[in-house]
């Protein structure tokens, strides 16, 4: 585990550079992304966000943009997109993805705790599984710094507490960086110290079983996720304490 921020950043950069270049890992991530992390209008995680937002003409940041897949989606919705990532290789992929589509998105290599953007630049900040890799207090301050007054940030993040997911994490330590830590509700609430007000949606209690549905094809797997997540939402309403056993969250942070 890192003892300094510089060590942490090195761990993160080296891990994600290596992961992206491993064909098997890429296939595993792609299957999981299509089934569980569906970012389209019909996805249970991001679908409600797209219904609530009109991104046309908005200036947005893809925080921890990776290879740019989510950035492309944001640009397709009419946003002026900027992205940052610690990995030079992934940023090169993101730039290529934008160039192929003539999107005009801009990408920068660097530390997410200290981005190159001026204060109050962005209407919205988006991130997918990035916060739990960072020093949260610094990350929250940076997100608040670059957001316009009244701006919002949306992050999809893993939670700690799902028994099956925790077992998988324990059994496969090499699939994660040594410094990452899934979020808990205290970590989410700690954003208030940076002037951000959080609102959290929890997902995937029973829906983790949808991975088995992938054996019948991705379409069946995605349909299984929607069905099981609908059940999960009913369970969360009936017994709110079950939210502590959810696998994933989508967190909306509003700048005060």
What is each model feature region?
Residues 124-137:
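A short SAM/SAH-binding and catalytic strip from SAM-dependent methyltransferases
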Residues 1-55, 154-176:
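Conserved class I S-adenosyl-L-methionine
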Residues 205-256:
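A C-terminal cap/extension of S-adenosyl-L-methionine-dependent methyltransferases
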Residues 61, 67-114:
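Class I SAM-dependent methyltransferase SAM/SAH-binding core
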Residues 180-197:
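Short alpha-helix
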Residues 138-149:
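A short glycine-rich, Lys/Arg-flanked "PGG" loop and its adjoining helix->strand segment in the class I
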Residues 113-124:
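A short acidic, Gly/Pro-enriched loop at the edge of an enzyme's catalytic core
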